[in-house]
């Protein structure tokens, strides 16, 4: 998805970071400039990257070979969720592909699930389409409050 959204350079950068586990300062600087903006598809704020705070040591530890970022898989535990759950999925999400979001939704008890996909959205559905996502979020919260 990174290649699709940002071209060969973004795809190669994602490969270096996630497949090879390269969290070197040069890769992380390129990540902030090239790949991180791809998480959103709309309402891009050119100064947003200036406000990003990242702990490089924690990121390197999490994404190292053998680290949690490479092994973390919660899917087997998803059926244990016993509370109402809202998933707003962006079909252009490079960080958690829509197929993975569908797997999570399919693993949940359908009586507890509110699920909606957004065609032209990335990882941040609310910033991408606030006019659609915020009412869904408000309704979800309101319905939980009134159903008690």
Roles of regions detected by a PLM:
Residues 82-83, 110:
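Active-site acidic short loop of glycosyltransferases
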Residues 1:
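Conserved hydrolase catalytic core segment
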Residues 30, 34, 102-103, 132-139:
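Alpha-helical elements of Rossmann-like donor-binding domains used by nucleotide-donor carbohydrate transfer enzymes
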Residues 102-113:
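Active-site-adjacent alpha-helix of alpha/beta-hydrolase-fold enzymes
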Residues 4-76, 83:
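Alpha/beta-hydrolase
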């Amino acid at each position: 998805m990174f290649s699709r959204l940002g071209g060969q350079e973004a795809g190669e950068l994602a490969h270096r970071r996630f497949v090879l586990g390269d969290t070197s300062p040069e890769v992380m600087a390129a990540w902030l400039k090239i790949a991180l903006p791809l998480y959103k598809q709309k309402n891009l704020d050119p100064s947003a990257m200036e406000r990003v705070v990242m702990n490089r040591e924690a990121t390197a530890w999490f994404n190292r070979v053998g680290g949690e970022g490479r092994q973390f898989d919660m899917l087997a535990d998803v059926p244990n969720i016993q509370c109402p759950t809202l998933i707003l999925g962006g079909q252009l999400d490079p960080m958690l592909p829509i197929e993975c979001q569908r797997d999570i939704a399919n693993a949940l008890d359908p009586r507890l699930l509110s699920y909606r996909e957004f065609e032209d959205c990335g990882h941040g559905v609310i910033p991408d389409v606030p006019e659609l996502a915020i009412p869904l979020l408000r309704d979800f919260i309101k319905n939980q409050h009134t159903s008690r």
